[in-house]
Design a protein with these regions (language model features):
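Short alpha-beta junction capping motif
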Residues: 20, 72-111
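Short, surface-exposed beta-strand/loop micro-motifs that present aromatic residues
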Residues: 63, 154-170
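Solvent-exposed loop/turn segments at secondary-structure junctions
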Residues: 25-29, 78-82, 100, 106-111, ...
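Sec-dependent N-terminal signal peptides
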Residues: 3-13
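Stable alpha-helical elements in mature extracytoplasmic
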Residues: 37, 41, 87-90, 109-117, ...
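Aromatic-Pro/Gly-enriched surface loop or interdomain linker
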Residues: 16-72, 78-79, 177-178, 184-212
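Acidic, glycine-rich loop-and-strand cores that form catalytic or ligand-binding grooves
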Residues: 116-146
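Loop/turn elements at helix/coil->beta-strand transitions in domains of secreted/extracellular proteins
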Residues: 18, 68-71, 96-100, 124, ...
């Protein structure tokens, strides 16, 4: 069950726009990659699954107390990630208090982020999420689990998660590049069907966060 902090947040925002955020981390990685992705996902979700999310996402640092204002925080990039001790403590408290962190590897982040996740949640394993998990079931069905958006190495797409007391608190999407699929159509020139898959999966993630 979500802790009191987030319960109060949801109660006070009922009927009003909620806000989600992009994580501005240290280490040299391009946390600012895919600038149009979150705004496009928000617009798509507001139009198709009746969310009421503010169109412009916030930007928040891992150690900031403002982190607790956002039920959903997104993180992406191509390279190095470093969480300081203060970052780790605040992020850990955020997740234990009911927050949700989605990390989308924009290709090149994997070797760095896995180490930081282990430091962040040393007592909880990062495990692969099966295709029958609810996050792949509604409102859009993905029978085979996470969709493939960009090829990169040609590996299969995988969704990993950290569960605490049976609640998914951290989602790590790997070898899919959802964020690229959320970008404006002319950024990567993805076929409309591929971009639609990415947006639908993103909508599923938001739906899961706001309803669990």
């Amino acid at each position: 069950m979500r802790k009191l902090l987030f319960l109060l947040l949801f109660i006070t925002t009922t009927g009003f726009s909620q806000e989600i955020a992009l994580l501005k981390y240290n280490g040299g990685g391009d946390w600012y990659a895919n600038p149009t992705s979150l705004p496009n996902l928000i617009k798509y979700s507001n139009q198709t699954i009746n969310t009421t999310i503010k169109v412009k996402p916030a930007t928040v640092e891992p150690s900031s107390p403002d982190l607790f204002s956002y039920p959903f925080v997104h993180m992406t990039g191509h390279g190095n990630v470093v969480f300081s001790n203060a970052d780790q403590a605040n992020l850990r408290n955020y997740l234990l208090s009911g927050g949700f962190l989605h990390i989308d590897d924009n290709y090149g982040m994997d070797e760095f982020i896995r180490k930081e996740i282990k430091k962040l949640l040393p007592n909880n394993d990062l495990i692969e999420i099966p295709a029958n998990h609810p996050i792949f079931q509604k409102p859009n069905m993905f029978a085979n689990g996470l969709p493939k958006i960009h090829e990169h190495d040609g590996k299969r797409p995988q969704a990993f998660g950290v569960f605490i007391n049976n609640r998914l608190v951290l989602l790590y999407t790997y070898e899919t590049d959802l964020g690229d699929g959320w970008e404006d159509p002319d950024v990567h020139n993805d076929p409309p069907a591929v971009r639609e898959k990415a947006l639908k999966m993103g909508a599923n993630i938001l739906n899961y966060v706001f309803n669990n």
